[in-house]
Amino acid sequence: MKRATVLALLSATLAKCLVQTGLDVLIASNYSQLAGRKVLVFSNPTGVTPLLHLGVDVMFESGKVNLVGVMGPEHGFRGTVQNGGGESTFVDSKTGLTVYDAYNVNSSVLMEYIRDSGADTVLFDLQDVGVRFYTYIWALYDSMVAAAATDAAFMVVDRPNPITGLDAFGPVLNESFITSYVGRRPIAQVHGMTVGELASMYVGEGWIRDASNGSSLTLTIIKMEGWERSMRFEDTQLPWVLPSPNMPTVDTAMLYGGACMFEGTSLSEGRGTTRPFELLGAPWANESWVQEMRKLDVPKTRYRFQCFTPTTSKFQGTTVCGLQTYMDLRQAGDDDEGFDAPFVGVNLLYTARRLFAAGSTSGEAPTSDSFHWLYSGTSTTYGIDVLTGSPLVREGLESGMTPEQIRESWTPRLQKFREIRKKYLLYH
């Protein structure tokens, strides 16, 4: 009776939604694509139905899917971990399934998970945010490589790109930076694709075959119904579940593709606040930053002076000042086919560096009284270079280039990516 009630409620809810996710389509098919399969699910709290039931729980309770385990990405399967961490492997108390920690591990470790679970199929269901350095699309890539190498089939239950799928923006990852977990292959900083489309690109461009020593992969995309490329997430009428602790709203996701570049600087990118990536600041920043940004008149954005006190991350417990970015998507601009977050981010970096840099502009910790670049972890590679996929943005700013000139410098490779991208688009 309980299962029948859940399915009846789900059917009624789906009728009210403009978009059905791949998970919804899978459930509506009575899991026909999974018949006879031993399924290892890669998911987290975003893998939900419109009724906010976790897909793994729904499949488990249905009794119609042979689940053999779960893999959890950054932040964990049940979403209990902050940025830069995963859960240790454990047994889920609700389902009794082994949950493997799949954050920041290579494909060899994922291969062991597949073998240990006895799976013959990996089912991927994560809500991405449309930005290259968000780690979920590289969890997708690595798990596809592992599936190919172990002869497991791979299925993606597709979900919307929450910041629209209209176009791609920003620099394309340089081949010399493909070892990073925030960039395995040369795609644009804001890619404008769904997870299913990216999976198709990974296979179609030969990247999975190359990374798995020539192994082929049987890939199935369970497509959405009703999604259009111009839709922001709120247009879908689906519930927004935080993909990660610092991604509370769709507006956060829209700005993330530009503002997260401040992670590689001595300024706070707003982590530890209720408005991460909208709020940027430092103890030594002031209202002049807002004044400079207003002079630049960056399309579709507005700015106001704001002070805040981060509860975690940079400047924890210290009051900092800076600005809050607002989007006005009604404004006309030269990026009318989407929101060019990387260009917004470069404008913010340009003004912050010009106003607040003093003396040396490099260092290992955000402790000095000026703007400087931070190294990535324990390496001597700048974090900004890892995030943008090359030294292009940093070196452009250091050489005195304007934001427009920097955007022009990444455009040739971006145009090539846009042409490749067209081959893999599944929706209009």
Task: List the predicted regions and their residue ranges.
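Fungal secretory targeting signals
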Residues: M1-C17
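Short internal beta-strands
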Residues: N66-H75, V157
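Glycine-rich, charge-decorated loop segments at or immediately adjacent to ligand/cofactor-binding or catalytic sites
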Residues: G79-N83, M155-I178
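Glycine-rich oxoanion-binding loops at beta->alpha junctions
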Residues: N83-A119, V131
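Glycine/threonine-rich flexible loop motifs
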Residues: D128-L140
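Conserved anion/nucleotide-ligand pocket segment
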Residues: I178-Y256
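Glycine-rich, aromatic-lined ligand/substrate-binding cores of catalytic
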Residues: G226-Q316
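Conserved functional hotspot residues or short segments at active or partner-binding sites
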Residues: A282-R407
